[in-house]
């Protein structure tokens, strides 16, 4: 019976490249001359630090742009609160990986409401979809892509 998995993953290498490109862009931008500003990547959290709140917003736009260029979906961004420490503003951005339980339940409910003849089940941080026909699975893929679940979805492990 054909099946596939719906997962939410990011490529950490591409995130690392995007952060390096963003740091490079910071060093060439005129409005960031003479300003202590940087991006730092540790595990799957990017920390932005600079002198003002306004510059943090600009840095976030730079990071979004470089992530899009590298093929990282910005829907995976989870922005944390801005911290003001002395004269430095810091903000952390975590990348969501894996489909959380409530999102997985919404996805399964959406598939069942569409009345497509498939079975969907939660397996850890992914959703497995099985069905008798490939066409049904492709309908589920189209449905998942068109859904607005605030999380990027990829399809892996397609088996016949």
UniProtKB/Swiss-Prot annotation:
One Pfam family assigned to this protein is DUF520
- Asked whether the keyword Ligase is assigned, the reply is no
Q: Cellular component per GO?
A: cytosol
Which terms are listed as keywords in the entry?
Answer: Nucleotide-binding
Please name the GO terms that the record assigns under molecular function: nucleotide binding
UniProt similarity note: Belongs to the YajQ family.
HAMAP family referenced in this protein's UniProt entry, alphabetically: YajQ
This protein is called what?
Nucleotide-binding protein Patl_4311
Q: Which organism is this entry from?
A: Pseudoalteromonas atlantica (strain T6c / ATCC BAA-1087)
């Amino acid at each position: 019976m054909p099946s596939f998995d719906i997962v939410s993953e990011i490529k950490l290498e591409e995130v690392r490249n995007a952060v390096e490109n963003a740091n490079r862009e910071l060093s060439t931008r005129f409005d960031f001359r003479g300003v202590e500003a940087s991006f730092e990547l540790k595990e799957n959290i990017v920390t932005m630090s600079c002198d003002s709140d306004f510059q943090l917003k600009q840095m976030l736009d730079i990071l979004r742009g470089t992530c899009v260029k590298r093929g990282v979906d910005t829907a995976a961004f989870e922005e944390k609160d801005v911290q003001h420490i002395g004269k430095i503003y810091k903000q952390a951005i975590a990348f969501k990986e894996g489909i959380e339980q409530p999102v997985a339940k919404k996805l399964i409910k959406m598939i069942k409401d569409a009345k497509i003849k498939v079975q969907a089940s939660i397996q850890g941080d992914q959703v497995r979809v099985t069905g008798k026909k490939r066409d049904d699975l492709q309908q589920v893929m189209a449905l998942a892509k068109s859904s607005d679940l605030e999380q990027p979805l990829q399809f892996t492990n397609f088996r016949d």
